[in-house]
């Protein structure tokens, strides 16, 4: 059965559903890497600028959208900036388990299936819950790569279901992804 559209899961309804020990069949997190580019602290010391992709609204982002955004931004930065010239971190983790009450949809169905109201549903995916002002992506880089970093974050933002903004600032002293 195909995945439901993201609009079905974009809004936050109810408390987070995260306790895997009580959830049978909870899907695994399908994001292989959260840190890309140069990850060593010694090499990152040369980066003087920080760009952040910040959420503007409260909402949920499915792990497929996070992975698509991570891949497109990482590939763009690797192609135009080079692996040694940036550090990219995905700052949110999809802990919330999404549920789906599957309904039958058959060819030639002349009557709609109604089903039980407020049914609990079975695990169908995962999502990260974000609040306004929360950092989704964090990039450290040198000032000469500013245009490429902003373009990479713009492309990543196009994959996400909630509005975001890009914040660029000088790197703080000893602070990591906040």
UniProtKB/Swiss-Prot annotation:
Q: What keywords would UniProt list here?
A: Ribonucleoprotein, Ribosomal protein
* Annotated Gene Ontology cellular component terms: ribonucleoprotein complex; ribosome
Q: Which GO terms describe its molecular function?
A: structural constituent of ribosome
Q: Does the keyword Transmembrane apply?
A: no
Ion transport found in the keyword field: no
Tell me the domain of life.
Archaea
Database matches in InterPro entries? Ribosomal_uL16, Ribosomal_uL16_arc, Ribosomal_uL16_CS_euk_arc, Ribosomal_uL16_dom, Ribosomal_uL16_euk_arch, Ribosomal_uL16_sf
Ranges that cross the membrane: none
Q: Which GO terms describe its biological process?
A: translation
Among HAMAP family, the record links this protein to: Ribosomal_uL16_arch (MF_00448)
What family name appears in the similarity comment?
Answer: Belongs to the universal ribosomal protein uL16 family.
Name the chain's protein: Large ribosomal subunit protein uL16
Q: Which species does the entry assign this protein to?
A: Pyrobaculum calidifontis (strain DSM 21063 / JCM 11548 / VA1)
Q: Supply the gene name.
A: rpl10e
């Amino acid at each position: 059965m195909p995945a439901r559209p993201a609009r079905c899961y974009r809004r936050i309804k109810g408390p987070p559903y995260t306790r895997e020990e009580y959830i049978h069949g909870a899907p695994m997190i399908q994001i292989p890497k959260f840190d890309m580019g140069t990850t060593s602290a010694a090499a990152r010391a040369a980066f003087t600028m920080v760009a952040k992709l910040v959420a503007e609204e409260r909402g949920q982002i499915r792990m497929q959208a996070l992975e698509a955004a991570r891949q497109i931004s990482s590939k763009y930065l690797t192609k135009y900036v080079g692996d040694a010239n940036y550090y990219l971190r995905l700052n949110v983790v999809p802990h919330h388990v999404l549920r789906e009450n599957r309904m039958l949809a058959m060819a030639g169905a002349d009557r709609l299936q109604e089903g039980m109201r407020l049914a609990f549903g079975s695990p169908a995916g995962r999502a990260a819950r974000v609040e306004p002002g929360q950092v989704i992506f964090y990039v450290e880089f040198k000032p000469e790569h500013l245009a490429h970093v902003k373009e990479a974050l713009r492309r990543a933002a196009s994959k996400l279901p909630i509005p975001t903004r890009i914040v660029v600032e000088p790197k703080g002293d000893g602070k990591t992804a906040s």
